[in-house]
Structure formats: structure tokens, C-alpha cells
């Protein structure tokens, strides 16, 4: 369903090691909004919910709710760092168009 690069796995592990709240994975949710119609919402989570797909890779879990699953099927998640910023990059084959910011799609 979702592929995580080594860089994304390392970023998730780092975030999990820094949180004060109990968490063992990353939740990816697709919500209406953004420049192109949909946007990604990311957060740390500690458990799966009814209907979630749970992807395990490199010792981390990714939770995806049932409504978001069709939007992210086949997606690759990467993490990049640059001079001005760092963040997750989404290579989503379901996106017909992407916003220049890289955080929303349609």
C-alpha cells in the first residue's frame, strides 16, 4: 500500500524518540483542503483504529484510516533535508495534480 524510504523511516524513528506522548507509529490521513483539493495530515499515534491499514517497515508502523486508503495506495513516502527546510515528500500515483508546495494534491 505505502512504501517508506530509509530516510523516511529514520525521520519517523527520530520523531518517535523525541515525543513525550506514547506513540509507536505515524498516522497518515488525507483531508479535503489545500490548493489542489486534498492535503496530507501527519501525526504520531499509538494504536490502530477500526478499518485502519497498518504498514510496518524498518521497525516503524504507519496507520492509514479506511477513507484515506484509496488516496494513498501505491504512494512512496520520503524525507528530505535542504538548506531552507526539511520534510516528508509524497510520490503519489493517485494524484492527478500537485500543488507547488508538495503538501496537497488533486
Swiss-Prot record:
PROSITE patterns: HESB
Gene Ontology BP, a term: iron-sulfur cluster assembly
Keyword Coiled coil: no
Source organism superkingdom: Bacteria
Chain ranges passing through the membrane: none
GO molecular function annotations of the record: 2 iron, 2 sulfur cluster binding; 4 iron, 4 sulfur cluster binding; iron ion binding
Keyword Lipid biosynthesis: no
Key words, A-Z: Plasmid
Family: Belongs to the HesB/IscA family.
NCBIfam families documented for this protein: iron-sulfur cluster assembly accessory protein (TIGR00049)
Name of the protein in its database record: Uncharacterized protein y4vC
Organism field: Sinorhizobium fredii (strain NBRC 101917 / NGR234)
Amino acid at each position: 500500500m505505502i512504501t517508506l524510504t530509509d530516510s523516511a523511516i529514520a525521520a519517523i524513528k527520530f520523531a518517535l524518540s523525541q515525543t513525550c506522548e506514547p506513540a509507536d507509529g505515524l498516522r497518515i490521513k488525507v483531508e479535503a483542503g489545500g490548493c489542489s483539493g486534498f492535503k496530507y495530515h501527519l501525526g504520531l499515534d499509538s494504536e490502530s483504529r477500526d478499518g485502519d491499514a497498518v504498514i510496518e517497515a524498518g521497525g516503524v508502523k504507519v496507520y492509514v484510516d479506511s477513507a484515506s486508503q484509496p488516496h494513498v495506495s501505491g504512494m512512496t513516502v520520503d524525507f528530505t533535508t535542504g538548506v531552507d527546510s526539511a520534510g516528508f515528500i509524497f510520490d503519489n500515483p493517485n494524484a492527478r495534480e500537485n500543488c507547488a508546495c508538495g503538501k496537497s494534491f488533486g
